[in-house]
């Protein structure tokens, strides 16, 4: 049963009637948010034995871990209010070691954690490389003007914390899009994209050496601009985003694996999991995402069982912009999961003021 089918009202009700002997949820991070229909339908399933598998048990905050345990072991971590008071709050806000250790002791008996290096000794090595993008003078002027304009608007924002946080995130998204290509923010401007130019240089070198490449972006319209570039250069490619029907999705994956196309353009959310694309030995992330675990899962479309060659992952990061600030958060995001699963330090959730500081520092 797919998650798309599960969250349909009629199918969800039908599946909730019997008591199943065993229920297994793969890619269980898809039910991390208790407010979603998908999560609510999953919680209604009755089973004597439940297993979940996920590469990202904590993507953003500990409330996600609470919801996963609500499925496999209801009541273990108490109500969400109790969990936030006893664990999430002290750990995320105050880096409380005692609370962290108590939570770890509670959940550890129910977790079997394996990292790739422990179970796949025969897998070729993976190399991660950050490529810095230098904005042109015109792009830098545009970015700084946009940054100042957004800061002025945010400084005038009134109202509750969550409302301000939403507006700050929207401003950050606009800056991130400007880092990719000015046309994504101001379509009427005819500024060339330094990031697209660097991408072209890297890609042509890879093609000259007979490599195949996966290209990920969070922005579908950014992928559209890259498609236009590939069309102009006569480069064969496959394409997949959230609007690609399942049957067509499989057809394009199979075609790429069979050698049809040297490049596969993929939206991060649509193709970051569940694909086997070992025909590629290079991965390019066009824009950094908040959570490095999501990028890692996308890179693992190439670096997985069946891969015979070393895999290289490039991340294109624009200098002196919001992208550098996001990359600096990656280490803290890794801490959030590792501190509970392995016992390291932890970072807290990001509030509106902390998000605003990312914009203030991104120049």
Tell where the protein language model's regions lie, with residue ranges.
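Long, charge-dense, solvent-exposed interaction surfaces that engage phosphate-rich ligands
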Residues: 100-102
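ASCE P-loop NTPase motor core, strongest for the SF2 helicase catalytic module
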Residues: 1-95, 104-363
